[in-house]
């Protein structure tokens, strides 16, 4: 059945050439309301406290400056709680949220050096980079675009716990998958938020890098105020409130046909920088 759905979307895709990286960036630049997330996966090399000290003392002031200027919307730092163990690829995740792709041009080494110099002309950037490299390994970075959610990311503080679901979706079924999430999942999660079952839900699409070697194309983020909220039993009757007489299993079968859950991780919030009511707000180390 999955192949039938994919074939039907292939017919439509034939009339729409694949968007190149340059076209993608150009389109996003024309729509500056798009929320772009630069997600950075990090592996600490030192004690946890030593790594967090580097983030707090060397990098957080820079994030605060960029958020205050409007170049960056927010910065979040999460610690991976599940999976745990020495064999996991990364144990911290930083999320840089931008109002569009234009700000991504400053994510290079030279761009970062220039931003530090702008903040403090006398700063020794090489010493900062050396201390940073000694404290952690940058495993990989990916760029995602916010597709849908119960509350736009730029309008709220991050939750203390987040379950992150990595989804594999064929390119030819991408638009259909997004429509399923918006039509069925979003109304349900909105009711879950009102019922106190969760705090927020978001759907993100990976836009850079692209290619068949990457095992997932989408991420959904389920956010919870605390561990108790994450593990509580769901409030009964929410599906019926959201979708009346629709049979729940029949709808979820539509999801199963076009996407696979590659893996799920649990992240715990460590620190953040956001801008609310024209003020920069921070928490954590």
Features from the language model and the residues they span:
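Positively charged n-region of N-terminal signal peptides that target proteins for export
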Residues: 1-4, 23
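Compositionally biased, low-complexity segments enriched in small residues
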Residues: 2, 15, 124-128
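Bacterial N-terminal signal peptides
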Residues: 7-16
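Short S/T/G/P-rich N-terminal loop/turn motif that feeds into the first structured element of a domain
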Residues: 22-116, 126-285
